Amino acid sequence: MAKSNKIFTNTLRLLALAATVVAIVFMVTSHDSAQVLNLTFTAKYSNTPAFKFLVIGEAIAGGYTVISILLSFKGLFWRLIVILDMVTTVLLTSSISAALAIAQVGKKGNTHAGWLPICGQVPDFCDYVTIALIAGFAAAIIYFVLLLCSLYVVLSPIFVATP
């Protein structure tokens, strides 16, 4: 792999790592409470399985990112990198999708099910979740670009080879 391509992919991996760390930090620290009819309502990420899934997915992606930066992959190992980049991209996409669905219900509610929006009562919680979702989307997009770069590295010899 060319040195410029290695620098580019490592830079993208560092950006992805930063995005996953930001998503984890903001999601884990998202909590707020409100007083409703003399009852204290506390909103925190650990109350929702989808938000836990986001944190776990981002943590796995961040761990894989650190490993992929530290190890030097050459030759046949790039095929493994393509597979792991694809798995990471799918994991990030699914975890962000699940968290976004729950965040949408929290923000807008669901009149058909009788669920009221909660962001009016716990705005700090919703703001932190929004930042975590934005960072999670950034990580997923960066990993999609990394997947395309990895595919290019693996497949370019096939298309460039002369008969």
Curated annotation (Swiss-Prot):
Side Cytoplasmic, residues: 1-6, 74-79, 150-163
Segments on the Extracellular face: 28-52, 101-128
Residues modified by glycosylation: N38
GO terms for cellular component: plasma membrane
InterPro entries: CASP/CASPL, CASP_dom, CASPL
Keywords, comma-separated and alphabetical: Cell membrane, Glycoprotein, Membrane, Transmembrane, Transmembrane helix
Localization: Cell membrane
Membrane topology, as annotated: Multi-pass membrane protein
Transmembrane portions of the chain: 7-27, 53-73, 80-100, 129-149
Family: Belongs to the Casparian strip membrane proteins (CASP) family.
Record text on subunit structure and interactions: Homodimer and heterodimers.
Protein name stated in the entry: CASP-like protein 1C2
Organism: Populus trichocarpa (Western balsam poplar)
UniProt lineage: Eukaryota, Viridiplantae, Streptophyta, Embryophyta, Tracheophyta
